Regions:
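Peripheral, non-AAA+ core regions of ATP-driven protein-machinery
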Residues: 1-122, 127
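Gly/Pro- and small hydrophobic-enriched strand-loop and loop-to-helix capping segments
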Residues: 130
Length: 130
């Protein structure tokens, strides 16, 4: 299933909207992040998987493709954890995708069942600029 959520990225002193597209399909394993993510964004996979597993949610046996657009904009930091996780939950039909329409997310997930979301440096600039 395909789902779209939104995030933000810092560009100089401004922020830009980032579209987070999540597609989950059978027949394959792993999470694939595309769209110029830095190493902290790539590490989102590990934080998201740990939070899901610790909350009893399973992603195993599924191929998850996450596209961060626009592809030419560098995405940095852990603030993409929350929009990716919410997109995955919606693609798994655990969250109603229609209720996410036009909503922007930012936050770093804790490993403790996903019950903690940390404030990120991106929250205020994104709120002001986008």
């Amino acid at each position: 299933m395909f789902v779209r959520t939104y995030a933000g990225a810092i560009v100089g002193i401004d922020a830009a909207a980032v579209t987070v597209e999540v597609n989950i399909a059978g027949g394959g394993l792993g999470m694939y992040l595309v769209g110029l993510p830095d190493s902290a964004v790539k590490e989102s996979e590990q934080r998201i998987r740990a939070a899901f597993e610790n909350s009893g949610e399973r992603m195993s046996g599924r191929k998850v493709v996450v596209s961060l657009a626009p592809a030419d904009l560098r995405k940095e930091g852990a603030s993409f954890d929350l929009p990716i996780a919410v997109g995955i939950l919606a693609a798994m039909s655990r969250v109603d995708a229609e209720t996410l329409a036009g909503t922007m997310f930012a936050g770093e997930l804790s490993l403790d069942r996903g019950n903690s979301v940390s404030y990120t440096h991106l929250t205020l600039p994104t709120r002001i600029s986008v």
